[in-house]
Each structure stands twice: as C-alpha cells, then as structure tokens.
Amino acid sequence: MADGRPAALDDFCRRFDISFFDLHLTCIFCSHTVDLQDLASFYLKKLSLVFRGGCYYACCSECLRLSARFEQENYFQCSIKAVNLEEVAQRKIKEICIRCICCLRLLDIVEKLDLLYSDQACYLIRGLWRGYCRNCIRKQ
C-alpha cells in the first residue's frame, strides 16, 4: 500500500468497507469474475491486487497456474539443490520467500524444510525462488 492503494484483499475490504463475501473482482488475465473459492485461494497465497485503468484485479486459480508455467518457461534463471539455498541466498531458509512453482502459493516452513531433507531443487524464476508445495508435489 505504498502508493495508498490497497494491495492485499483484506486491506481492500477494509478500505472500501466491503465484506469479503460481497467482492466482485475480475481476473487480470481472462477477464472472468473471480469466484469466492479462488478469491480465498488468492488471499491465502498472499498475492497482491493489480490496479490498472482505475480498476482492481485479482487472478483466478487457472490463470495463476498458467502464469506460473509461463514464467517458468520464459524467465527461468537457474536451479539449485535446496540444501545449497541458504548459502546462495545468504539467509536462513525460514527467511527466504519461496513460492510454489505450479500454483504460486507461499511455502510454509515445513514445506521449505521438506525441500531440504528430500533433496529437491529450488528454482530461481524472475529473481524469486520457487519450489513445490505439498499439494502440487503430489500431482507430479
């Protein structure tokens, strides 16, 4: 909210005095109305609203997956074993922001540690670290 505009859904609801259940936001990519389940997912993933052309936009789950795949295919920088991530990032694993490579959900500490102990890779995409969350790794 550096420019005064709310970026998080809860800030948006507070700022405009709207109940979460009454939100009607459009997907930035497909222009469909983002349903309540996808809005909840968007909120839990701690994603930011986009303000463009005087309107606020969110993103539906399907477009998030497509966006994640697009970024992986077009902005991939490198991959490293998770055991080397702390050394490369020069921060503790709990301090490193890692999103899921498939669904863009923020990984919690358990998922980050699972990356380490199961010898998985982490991927640098667009300057941000990615790995598999517990839901998407099962779908592989």
Swiss-Prot record:
GO CC terms of this entry: host cell cytoplasm; host cell nucleus
Lineage top rank: taxon: Viruses
Keyword list, A-Z: Activator, DNA-binding, Early protein, Host cytoplasm, Host nucleus, Host-virus interaction, Inhibition of host innate immune response by virus, Metal-binding, Modulation of host cell apoptosis by virus, Transcription, Transcription regulation, Viral immunoevasion, Zinc, Zinc-finger
Compartmental location: Host cytoplasm; Host nucleus
InterPro entries per UniProt: E6 (IPR001334), E6_sf (IPR038575)
unnamed zinc finger segments: 27-63, 100-136
GO MF: DNA binding; zinc ion binding
Entry keyword Manganese: no
Primary subcellular site in the record, as a coarse category: host cell
GO biological process: DNA-templated transcription; regulation of DNA-templated transcription; symbiont-mediated perturbation of host apoptosis; symbiont-mediated perturbation of host ubiquitin-like protein modification; symbiont-mediated suppression of host innate immune response; symbiont-mediated suppression of host type I interferon-mediated signaling pathway
Free-text function comment from the UniProt entry: Plays a major role in the induction and maintenance of cellular transformation. E6 associates with host UBE3A/E6-AP ubiquitin-protein ligase and modulates its activity. Protects host keratinocytes from apoptosis by mediating the degradation of host BAK1. May also inhibit host immune response.
SUBUNIT field: Forms homodimers. Interacts with ubiquitin-protein ligase UBE3A/E6-AP; this interaction stimulates UBE3A ubiquitin activity. Interacts with host BAK1.
Family to which this protein belongs: Belongs to the papillomaviridae E6 protein family.
Name the record gives this protein: Protein E6
Organism, scientific name: Human papillomavirus 65
